[in-house]
Regions:
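Membrane-water interface segments at the C-terminal ends of transmembrane alpha-helices
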Residues: 1, 7-121, 149, 153-167
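Short hydrophobic faces within alpha-helices
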Residues: 13, 55, 126-134
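Glycine/proline-centered hinge or cleavage motifs at structural transition points of membrane proteins
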Residues: 134-135, 148
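Glycine-rich helix-loop "coupling/hinge" segments at transmembrane-helix boundaries
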Residues: 169-172
């Protein structure tokens, strides 16, 4: 009871929930677009992205946080590169919600994308071709076939991302 009546505890819970919801929305949006690209294109770029998008899963989280800190801090790599072009770019992404959300997205995109790619791979090409044969354009095919057939897996990905972030203590 004290947890929900204390003003500091309540503010912390609301802040954590807000960061988690924003992270879930952005992660699922990026992951779904990436999964669509990986599923429906077959070229060298998509094969390269299909290999490299899993990279964050193999980097320990503490190492990734430290690496990102050296890149996005006000005296980090982004600022030094901008100084070469005469700008003093201070991203302001460290020690605030934007930095936490950025790191949470980095950690969760591979996992959510794997789930959604799996769902999209389960949609047979014949289903999409059938819809196009009866005159459906790409937008109609997406909203009437692809999205409804993949929404359950998207909800699963959302649940995993939500649960991973609501209890995450990796990124301070």
């Amino acid at each position: 009871v004290y947890l929900f009546t204390d003003e500091i505890s309540t503010a912390s819970i609301v802040y954590t929930f807000w960061i988690t919801v924003v992270t879930v929305i952005v992660t699922i949006a990026i992951s779904y677009l990436l999964a669509l690209y990986l599923r429906f294109t077959d070229n060298k770029v998509s094969k390269f992205i299909g290999t490299i998008y899993l990279l964050p899963r193999f980097i320990p989280s503490l190492v990734a946080v430290y690496a990102m800190t050296t890149i996005i801090r006000d005296s980090g790599l982004l600022n030094r590169i901008s100084l070469l072009f005469g700008n003093n770019f201070k991203p302001g992404l460290l020690y605030n919600a934007k930095g936490i959300i950025l790191m949470n997205i980095w950690f969760n995109i591979p996992f959510a994308t794997m789930i959604i790619v799996s769902a999209l791979s389960g949609i047979q090409d014949s289903v999409i071709e059938s819809a196009r044969d009866v005159g459906a354009n790409q937008i109609r095919v997406f909203f009437s076939m692809i999205l409804p057939l993949s929404i359950k897996d998207v909800m699963i990905a959302m649940t995993f991302v939500f649960m991973g972030n609501i209890s995450s203590f990796t990124t301070p």
